[in-house]
Amino acid sequence: MTKRYWNINLEEMMGAGVHFGHGTRKWNPQMAPFIAAKRKGIHIINITRTARFLSEACDLVFDAARRGKKFLIVGTNNKAADSVARASRKARCHYVNKKWLAGMLTNWSITETRLNKFRDLRMEQKKGGLNHLLKRDATMFKRQLARLQTYLGGIQYMTGLPDIVIIVDQHKEYTALRECITLGIPTICLIDTNCDPNLSDISIPANDDAISSIRFILNKLVFAICEGRFSYLINP
């Protein structure tokens, strides 16, 4: 994997609050190598390590995108949801930002059935199928479609398992992470000081509570994916 320059600026990381970890009482000792200090009861993340692993992750996704690989970005906590959706749309990645449905990957055949149902309902709506339903039935139709849009809207064009999964907030998305491990899908995980860095293929130590920190990390990864896709288009 070729190393590239991704303009990861330490001052910008500080400004985004990437270095702020959790309280010192809420930490995983496995994170000790990534912690630089303690300040006012919280751990301070060593952002030089963050920059190193973020750069490695950018190299990985660039090379994968250049080979036409598919990505899934997962982040369902309230602070991550909007950033995940925005970043995913920009890089044309699949995403889950509301709720991870257990078995979404490990029971792919069931997920595929749900996606087909979702697509059928959307097609029916576009054709004006609602116009021929009773008011009560139309209400139920809309409710079902809205629910599917909420939980499956970000993966509606997914036709198979992703090649790489990017996860924001290891604790919140532990089920998704375990499914990736079970299936052998490579993962890139944003990890705070209460996480286990050994569970992902690439763990990026960073504040997973601040929107600015999440956005900083995702923006770098998305830029690398977009660059890789462009390289794929001009050199297929």
UniProtKB/Swiss-Prot annotation:
Cellular compartment(s): Plastid
Entry keywords, A to Z: Plastid, Ribonucleoprotein, Ribosomal protein
Annotated InterPro entries: Ribosomal_uS2, Ribosomal_uS2_bac/mit/plastid, Ribosomal_uS2_CS, Ribosomal_uS2_flav_dom_sf
Record bears the keyword Transport: no
Taxonomy, superkingdom: Eukaryota
GO terms (BP aspect): translation
An example Gene Ontology CC term for this record: plastid
Chief localisation class: plastid
UniProt xrefs under Gene3D superfamilies: Glucose-6-phosphate isomerase like protein, domain 1, Helix hairpin bin
A GO term, aspect molecular function: structural constituent of ribosome
Family: Belongs to the universal ribosomal protein uS2 family.
PANTHER family: 30S RIBOSOMAL PROTEIN S2 PROKARYOTIC AND ORGANELLAR (PTHR12534), SMALL RIBOSOMAL SUBUNIT PROTEIN US2M (PTHR12534:SF0)
Protein name: Small ribosomal subunit protein uS2c
Origin species: Cuscuta reflexa (Southern Asian dodder)
